[in-house]
Every structure is written in C-alpha cells, then in structure tokens.
C-alpha cells in the first residue's frame, strides 16, 4: 500500500530567523547537487572498553565497529544489513554523532564532523536526523504529539512561518496522520502511528540526511509496507538522502539504491541493489540471500539451496584473525585465516572483502589470491581431497582402534593381576 502525497506537503514551509529564505519542508532545497558525495566515512571504529576490578582498569574492548569505509551520495538510499550484533546500529549512531568514535573520520558535505563538540554539532543537527528503532520508547509518554514534533524548532530556535503549531499539523498530515491529533499523547496511537510521529519529528527541520535504524522491525507486517512506502514517497517529494539499517532483506531491497553487508563490525560487501541480489560475491551475502523465503512454490522447489552456516558468530571482544568470516565459511583456506582481505572493487559498482569471491570468473588482484587457480582447484581437486580425507579418516580410525584395544588388554591384564594377588 502506497501512502498518497498529502496536499499540505506541497505548501511552502516555514522560514527561520537565522537563515531567511530557507524553506522548512519545501521540495528539493538541498545544497548538495544530486549525485555529489554527502557523507563520507573513512576507517570508522567504535570500541567499547571492558573494565574490571576496584580500579576499573580496562581489560579488553568490544569491537562493535572496526574500520569501515563508505560514501553516500545526495538523493540516494544506502541500505545496511547484517545479523544482530554486527554493528549496524552503532554505525548509525556514529555517523549521526550520538556516539563518539574511537578512530576514523566522518565527513558531511566535505566537513570533518568527527570530533565536533555539542556546540559545533548543534547547527548540523538540522541537516542530520535519526529515526529510532523502537517507536514505543523513542517518544516521551508525558509529552503531547505537538510538543514532541515541535521540539526541534524550539531546540534550534527556529520560528516557522505561521507558528510551530501550524507547521507541526502540516508535518502530521504529510506522514498520514490527522492534524487534529496535535494534543494527543503517544499511548493513544498504534505502533505504526507512533513510528509516523517519529518520522515527522525527524523531518521537522528539513534534513539532508536521515538515518533510519530498523524503522519497521517493531511493527506488524501489515503496517511495515505502509511505513516503507511513506519513506519512499517522502524521499521523492523532499529529495531526502537515507541510510536505512535493517535485517529484513526484502525491506532493504525495496527501498535501497546500494546495499552494504556488515559482519562482525566490518563491511564485507558493498554493491548496487540489482548486482547484489542477482550475483552476490561474498559467501556471507550468499548465505543471507539463501535464507530469504520465495513465495512461489515452483521457484522455491527449483531454488531450494539453503546455506546453513556452521557455528555461531564469534565474539566481537576477540574476533578471529584474518577474514572474520573464515570460522563459518565453507570456502576458507589458509590465506583466509592469516590475511584480512581488503574491500576491493572487483566488478563495476560492486566491492567485496573476500579472497575467494562468488560469481567471479576473472583473476583477482595479486595481493589477495589468484582466483583462476582457485577456480581450477574448485573444479579439479574435490575428488582427490575427498579421497585423501577418507584415507586420513580410515588411518585415524585404525590408530584409535589399536590404542583402544591395547588399553583394554592392559586393563584386563591389570584386573587379572589384582585378582591373582588377592587369591594369594
């Protein structure tokens, strides 16, 4: 279901005292031209220290985000997917500066905002907003909807044309809510309506970048499509740039232009939507895609190869050496255990951090691995490997049997000896 554009959405927005002539809520009032880099992240890290003892000395760290690089262009939507605990939400809070990074750089419109203080970030809060995951805890239950949605105007000392109340009612109508509900409280709304209120609050100051952290995960399936379509409509109408964090691959496919796949604090693949879903190159991405249910019984029976990953996700406190996915990867070799693969563009618009990528026939750069040799090995060696494995298993089984038999004979002799000495 697509949410129709509201008539109020086309009205000229409010102006601010600080910047006359800037429209709040007007269409396409962005400084960055479409296609220009709006957000650039380089080597971003966030390590949460682990402290123990009376003196609270640091004994380790949780490597939630451990060196990621990506760019977001004006007007596009970047989707970020991965398992729970991979660092998606932490990354979202880092680029909105709700968390202080451990290392790395965050640039917004070419300006380094990595270490700006509260005062330095205040003007940028108008341009960078966040939609939080839980609509039940992100709204203050003691405040009315008018107070919640109007808070950004008061915090930024912005006076909309016609007053705050009129602008808040316009925003409520834009997100598909009744403007007359201005004086109601959050508990009087459903989960989907509360998320719409959160979206209205994020759009209040006409931001350039909106980071949406699992915007539909807490909602019923029947409501998810409405909220997703609303975000899409608002992007078309207002020229917004999104970073959408989610674990639902269907949602990400519907709204994203490019998709980043995260695993254990790292981006393992970054590609255009069509390329990623048609031919994923990282084994982890391929495993994620195989878990997406296919609603067509005929296609489901024809494409029923579900990849079940072995083991659990390693702890971010002590991640594996080399490629972090090698402990669960069916293609892992020695180079995967010792050398961390860089995120390289192996196809136009498709970057992957893997020594043995999927759906890739050409030779990879020499600093990773010779993929032509890996491909030949994959086609020619399996029988020999299986035979060698079988021989090894048989030899090991024979050795264990001999040791067991010798141990049993020794135990029997000891029992006989004890029995004889007891008779004497």
Regions picked out by a protein language model, each given a short descriptive name:
Residues 185-189, 193:
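Conserved ABC ATPase signature
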Residues 40, 111-112, 163-180, 289-290:
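Conserved ABC ATPase "signature" region
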Residues 2-5, 23-37, 50-56, 61, ...:
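Short catalytic/signature loops enriched in Gly
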Residues 104-112, 124:
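Conserved ABC transporter NBD signature motif
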Residues 81-82:
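The feature captures the beta-strand-to-loop junction immediately N-terminal to the Walker
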């Amino acid at each position: 279901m697509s949410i129709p554009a509201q008539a109020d959405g086309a009205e000229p927005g409010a102006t601010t005292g600080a910047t006359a002539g800037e429209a709040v809520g007007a269409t396409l009032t962005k400084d960055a031209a479409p296609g220009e880099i709006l957000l650039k992240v380089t080597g971003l890290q966030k390590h949460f220290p682990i402290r123990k003892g009376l003196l609270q000395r640091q004994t380790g760290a949780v490597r939630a985000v451990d060196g990621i690089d990506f760019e977001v262009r004006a007007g596009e939507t970047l989707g970020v997917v991965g398992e729970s605990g991979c660092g998606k939400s932490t990354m979202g809070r880092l680029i909105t500066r709700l968390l202080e990074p451990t290392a790395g750089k965050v640039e917004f419109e070419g300006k380094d905002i990595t270490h700006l203080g509260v005062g330095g970030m205040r003007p940028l809060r108008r341009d960078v907003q966040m939609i939080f995951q839980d609509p039940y805890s992100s709204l203050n239950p003691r405040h009315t909807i008018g107070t919640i949605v109007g808070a950004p105007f008061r915090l930024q000392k912005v006076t909309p044309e016609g007053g705050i109340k009129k602008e808040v009612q316009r925003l409520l109508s834009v997100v598909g809510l009744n403007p007359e509900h201005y004086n109601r409280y959050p508990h009087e709304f459903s989960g989907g309506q509360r998320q719409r209120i959160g979206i209205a609050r994020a759009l209040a100051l006409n931001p350039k970048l909106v980071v949406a952290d699992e915007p539909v995960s807490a909602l019923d399936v029947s409501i998810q499509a409405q909220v997703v379509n609303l975000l899409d409509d608002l992007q078309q109408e207002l020229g917004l740039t999104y970073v959408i964090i989610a674990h639902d691959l269907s949602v990400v496919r519907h709204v994203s232009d490019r998709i980043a796949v995260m695993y254990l604090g790292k981006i393992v693949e970054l590609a255009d939507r069509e390329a990623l879903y048609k031919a994923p190159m990282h084994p982890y991405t391929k495993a994620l895609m195989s878990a997406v249910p296919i609603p067509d019984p005929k296609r489901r029976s024809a494409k029923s190869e579900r990849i079940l990953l072995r083991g659990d996700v390693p702890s971010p406190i002590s991640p594996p050496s080399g490629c972090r996915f090698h402990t669960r990867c069916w293609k892992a070799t020695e180079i995967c255990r010792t050398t961390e693969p860089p995120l390289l563009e192996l196809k136009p618009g498709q970057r992957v951090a893997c020594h043995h990528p999927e759906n890739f026939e050409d030779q990879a750069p020499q600093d990773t691995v010779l993929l032509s040799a890996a491909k030949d090995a994959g086609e020619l060696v399996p029988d020999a490997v299986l035979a060698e494995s079988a021989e090894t298993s048989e030899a090991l089984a024979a050795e264990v049997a001999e040791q067991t038999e010798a141990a049993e004979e020794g135990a029997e002799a000891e029992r006989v000896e004890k029995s004889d000495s007891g008779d004497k």
